[in-house]
Structures are given as C-alpha cells and as structure tokens.
Amino acid sequence: MTSTQEQGPDIVSAPLRDAATVVLVRDAADGIEVFLQRRVKQMAFAGGMTVFPGGGVDKRDADADLAWTGPEATWWAGQFGSDAEIAQALVCAAVRETFEECGVLLATDADGAFADPEGLAEDRQRLVEKSLSFAQFLTARGLTLRADLLRPLAHWITPVNEKRRYDTRFFLAAMPDGQHADAETTEAEVARWVNARVAIDSWAAGQHFLMPPTWSQLNYVSQFSTIDELLDAERVIEPILPNVTPGAGLAGLGFPGSDEYFRTLGDQQPPEITL
C-alpha cells in the first residue's frame, strides 16, 4: 500500500464500501478533456465537490449472467488486487454509474453498434431507482458490456477518520463516438467537459474544489497529449490510503503528491463556488 495509515486513539473506522469511478476523456484541440461534475451540496459524501462520474457497487453488479467483451474478471482482479467476483462488480458498477450519471453507455448491440442512450431513458431511471439491475438491463436490450473500452487507472481508499468510506477503483474510458455526456442527474448541479490542466488551474484559482483523488487523476491525465497515449500507457495500480493526522483536518492528510497539492491549495477550504 502506497501510504501507511496512522490512527489516533479516538478514530473508529467506518466500514469500507467498494466503489467505481470513471475518468471519461476525449481529445480536443487544446489537449485531453475530462468530463467533470460538481456534486450538489446536499450530498452526504463530497457535497459541492468537483468529481468524475461514479458511485458505490450494487451487490447485483456481481451477477455474472450478462454478455461481456474484453478482459475477463480475473484480469481486472489482478489489476486491482481483489477477487474475481468483486472485480466483475467493479467493472459493471463503472459502466452502470457512467450511464446513470451522464448518459454514456459503454455497451454495444449484436452488430457492435453503440446503443442510443436517448431511447433508454426509462431504463436509465429504473437503474437509478434500483428497480432494475444492470445485468437485467443489458440482457433485456441485447447489449454487451464493453470491458475492453475501460482501462485501470488508480485505487484510492477513504481515510479512516471519514464517516463514509469507500474502496474506490478508478477507470479510464474514451468517450464513444455518437454519444453525448449530459447533466441529467440529481447528484450534480453542473457537468461539463474541461481540459485536464485547465481544471487544475481553475481549482488553484479557487473556482471550484478538488479532493485529492480527483486532483491526482487530473494531474496524471494532464501529462498526456492524446487519448491514445493515455490509454496505451502502462500503469501499476497500488492502493493509496492517505495518512491521517488526528485533529488537523484536510491539511493533516498525507498521500503521494500531497506536498504539491497543499502548496497549490494554499489557504483554500471546500468553498461554495462554481465549476
């Protein structure tokens, strides 16, 4: 594990929940753009923060009864240090959450064509309401999950002092041709495509707020000129569990790159500002 966790005597760790986050990217004239959302302030976790689409694993995401193209669950398990069942659930959660939160569906029909998300609005809402499982949705629509369109990116674990804790695997995915990322989710106030470096610079200027995991992924993406270079890059995924200095708040977190993060952050605190 990249960071060793320090616990104070009064810290009682909340249970971890598996989660998946997708860094959706596209090429643009000025470099790689990422799809970002600003979560509504009322959200119990990361309210008001700028984030990527993603969320917790639904236990039904582990349902193996679905069509799947790309690396098998055992390969993903090796990348993320989990068992195959959890790995499959993480991949399914990544694709499901991306569809639920921004309408982008990484699944194709029998002819290899991407489904039209606009014609699946009712299914999308049922997935959000959890009245339909992702496997049921794909099977009913004759769709195949495209695990080959995803790449493993990172693995962050919420510090032990947080009330809600997630064991989050980050995925990369290129925006499919012919699809449109929208803001039709109750979890976000604003959603838009932003150049990765611009997103960091605007955070440094106090225009929005990035949590360390989000900042870290943007910082990584900004080092590449094209999506092909980014997707083809070799990565070794190591879990990152930030150190905690009890009573020190955000400034008490230690993680890879934390010196740069806090130097750029300066005196900012999570603000009520715009993306």
Can you annotate each of these PLM segments?
Residues 1-275:
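N-terminal leader/linker segments that precede catalytic domains of diphosphate-processing enzymes
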